[in-house]
Amino acid sequence: MKPVKNRYSRITKKFPREFILLQGKGCFWKKCTFCDYYEDVCKNPFEINSKVIENITGEFGVLDVINSGSAMEIDPQTLDLLIEKVNEKNINEIWLEVHWTYKDKLERFSEKFKNKVVKYRTGIETFNPKLRTIWNKGIPEDVSPAEVAKYFKSVCLLVGTENQTFEDVISDINIAKKYFERFMINVFEENSTPVKENKLLINRFLNEIYPAIKDDPKIEISLNITDLGVG
């Protein structure tokens, strides 16, 4: 993956919040065909993460935390400092990103953030079960949108890779609108994996879908991986 240049961001549009990218211990899954984020690891993540956490001001009362895997894979020292900072800055709402496999551990993990509203997002990427299998997401094909929504308030959708169709994208957006409080759309950029961009699909998305949804308050769209200020 490309070197990370920035790990802290202030997002002021649609969903105002502080947004941080921490280093985890490395995603346990590491099998999604299009992803190389799990390479964002080092021997002492706390050394990096402590500096990122010090930037938190509590300005919006909302903090969004992502890392090179799932929130449960943040090292204990970093997690303790994060909780301390959340309390110190009177942050009331925390968003965390986790893999589907951790769904039954969300309630217990939320208890670490006492008296806070903790909401979770997962990288479902698509609601087309066959496509999820091609992408090796590690989410069973019989998992329905309604079941995902039992655990998660938000999802990430991926647009613009091989084997994906225009109809897939339309369907995914409509399903996400129906079931989730908010969601993110990430336009795929080629990275160190063998997966290639579907440039025709990306162009159709930009010309035929993006103009109609870009101002929707439920939807954040990253046309580039650093559009939210981290990466």
Residue ranges with predicted function:
Residues 43-47, 74, 135-140, 164-171, ...:
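Alpha-helix N-cap and loop-to-helix initiation/capping positions
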Residues 2-41, 60-67:
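N-terminal pre-triad scaffold of radical SAM enzymes
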Residues 127-129, 147-172, 186-195, 227:
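Conserved strand-turn element in the central/C-terminal portion of the radical SAM core barrel
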Residues 74-83, 103-113, 167-169:
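Distinct, well-ordered alpha-helical segments
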Residues 37-52, 59-76, 86-104, 117-142, ...:
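Core AdoMet radical
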Residues 79-89, 140-156, 201-223:
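Alpha-helix-loop-beta-strand connector modules within alpha/beta enzyme cores
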Residues 87-90, 111-115, 149-150, 177-179:
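Short, conserved loop/helix-junction motifs that constitute active-site signature segments
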Residues 2-16, 59-60, 170-231:
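Auxiliary Fe-S-binding modules of radical SAM enzymes
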